[in-house]
Amino acid sequence: MHSEMLLHSVKADLHEKQEQIHQLKRVLHEIRQIKHDFSEAQHLIHRPHLNREAWRGTHAERFEDIREGMNKAYQQIKSDQVSGIIESIEGKIHSLEGDVYSIRRQITRIEHEIEKEKHKK
């Protein structure tokens, strides 16, 4: 009886880990899509295009400096922050998949133990 209760508990743990993996994979897909959309919008920083003949002087230089700062910030967010989040989620998924593998092995051992107990009776 103890083994059957343990089996039920371990199967519940397995289901919980699998659900966590499913949710993380869904979120990972959404974040990757957002990163793609974010990358697609980066070119808008340089709009409207202002040529040097029509746009010059102190304000023009300051405006271009602001644009360049925005471009660098975009790159940092995309490459450092978002990529870091993606790597973190991928690491957690990998860890949970390892847990699932271990839990499945544990379930197999418990099921064998239950079979042994049944044959003893």
Curated annotation (Swiss-Prot):
Gene ablation phenotype (knockout): Deletion of the yxiB-yxiC-yxiD-yxxD-yxxE operon has no visible growth phenotype, however it is out-competed by wild-type cells.
Pfam families per the UniProt record, alphabetical: YwqH-like
Family annotation (InterPro entries): YwqH-like
Protein name: Protein YxiB
Gene (name only): yxiB
